[in-house]
């Protein structure tokens, strides 16, 4: 199965920005907040392995990998939500995370879902 070709106007990761405007485009309509929320827990094995890494200092690769995967999953869910709202871009994108229990972390990715049009002359 092949993916259908995307419209040049379709929402893709390159149309997501932390800025309040998408460069080279004018915001035509704000559609509301798009968000993706992921709740992850650490396994007993992962927690033990990470505890061993803390003895030696430096980057705790097990937690780094878990955080990267959680952020990417939250980002993907935010894109899905923005598409559902009819957006072709997301501006003012942010991440936040909170530990909601022992070893349980919530990661949220959110931004303003918008419809944009290329600036005149583009």
UniProtKB/Swiss-Prot annotation:
Could you tell me what this protein is called?
Answer: UPF0145 protein Bmul_3577/BMULJ_04940
> HAMAP family annotated for this entry?
UPF0145 (MF_00338)
Q: Could you tell me which PANTHER family the record lists for this protein?
A: UPF0145 PROTEIN SCO3412 (PTHR34068:SF2), UPF0145 PROTEIN YBJQ (PTHR34068)
Protein family (similarity comment):
Belongs to the UPF0145 family.
Superkingdom, taxonomy of origin: Bacteria
Which species is this UniProt entry from?
Burkholderia multivorans (strain ATCC 17616 / 249)
Q: Which InterPro entries match?
A: UPF0145_dom_sf, UPF0145_YbjQ-like
């Amino acid at each position: 199965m092949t993916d259908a070709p995307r419209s040049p106007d379709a929402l893709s990761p390159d149309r997501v920005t932390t800025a309040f405007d998408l460069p080279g485009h004018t915001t035509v309509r704000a559609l509301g907040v798009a968000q993706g929320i992921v709740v992850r827990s650490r396994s007993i094995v992962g927690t033990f392995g990470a505890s061993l890494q803390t003895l030696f200092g430096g980057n705790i690769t097990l937690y780094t990998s878990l955080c990267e995967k959680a952020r990417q999953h939250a980002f993907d869910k935010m894109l899905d939500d923005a598409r559902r709202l009819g957006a072709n871009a997301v501006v003012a994108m942010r991440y936040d995370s909170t530990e909601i229990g022992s070893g349980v972390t919530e990661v949220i990715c959110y931004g303003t879902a918008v419809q944009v049009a290329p600036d005149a002359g583009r």
